[in-house]
Amino acid sequence: MKLRGCGTALVTPFKQDGSVDFAAQRALVEWQIESGIDFLVPCGTTGETPTLSHDEWLKVIAQTVEVNHGRVPIVAGATSNNTAEAVEKAKEVAAIKGVDAILTASPYYNKPTQEGQYLHFKAIAEAVDKPLVLYNVPGRTAANIETATLLRLAKIPNIIAVKEASGSLPQIMDVCAQKPEDFTVLSGDDALTLPILAVGGVGLVSVASNQIPKELSEMVRAALNNDWATARKLHNHFLALMNANFLESNPGPVKAVLAMMGRIEENYRLPMVPMRPENRAKLEKIAAEAGVLKNATVAQ
């Protein structure tokens, strides 16, 4: 399996009473696929997975698979900072027919050494027969997967890719220059996608594609086809929105815009909260200028 193109790190819609809005989630998945997205990533950070119960986590993944019906690859999130638990979660996801790969992040909070991270990911890989996509996001985990460690992990047959959100272009360039041919680098940062694609990345796991799946899929596709003029035009047009999605902690802003678009209700689970009014107003202005609010619909 080789992931390529733009994949959406899906939000998880909630109702006002705090329950998962499965009807809105179903509609979002269908809209994403109809818009030309290349793959889908349910239950990552953007999906507020830490606030989902175990049962809800599995149900969100299962419904994504059901709605997808084999049309695009599904890369389901399964992460824990307890290796034994991470292994069990990966096994559960691997057992869901229609899940194509598993996204798993570095152990967070307990700050393992590089050897600890290597053995953690190795244990997960050896426990399942599904491809693994590693998620390097040290800004959240406090545990960077260094290049030497990642290159060791890339030798494990079913570790096929990394979602790179370290924010360090020098590190990402080193990985791209030294990685095996069959190991894939995916951008985990919307705003850095074009530089990452230019040095050897082949895709993006996106937050902003929740809002603009068609446009970001076209941007990545254009870059991969060496149509850099089109890719730059789309990047420059949506760069302000990409950055505004992080005016506050993700997924606050992306869910706010989706609510403005009429695609979900704007509800969160603590500790996530609605945006401050001044930031929400700034975000709405940027979203309107980017043109994403012009076709707002009625929320499902």
UniProtKB/Swiss-Prot annotation:
GO BP annotation list: diaminopimelate biosynthetic process; lysine biosynthetic process via diaminopimelate
Reactions this protein catalyses: L-aspartate 4-semialdehyde + pyruvate = (2S,4S)-4-hydroxy-2,3,4,5-tetrahydrodipicolinate + H2O + H(+)
Pathway named in the protein's UniProt entry: Amino-acid biosynthesis; L-lysine biosynthesis via DAP pathway; (S)-tetrahydrodipicolinate from L-aspartate: step 3/4
List of catalytic residues: Y135, K163
GO CC, any one term: cytosol
Chief localisation class: cytoplasm
Record's keyword annotation contains Transmembrane helix: no
Keyword terms, alphabetized: Amino-acid biosynthesis, Cytoplasm, Diaminopimelate biosynthesis, Lyase, Lysine biosynthesis, Schiff base
PROSITE patterns: DHDPS_2 (PS00666)
Binding partners and assembly: Homotetramer; dimer of dimers.
Family from the record: Belongs to the DapA family.
Listed PANTHER family: 4-HYDROXY-2-OXOGLUTARATE ALDOLASE, MITOCHONDRIAL, DIHYDRODIPICOLINATE SYNTHASE
Name of the protein this chain belongs to: 4-hydroxy-tetrahydrodipicolinate synthase
Originating species: Koribacter versatilis (strain Ellin345)
This protein's encoding gene: dapA
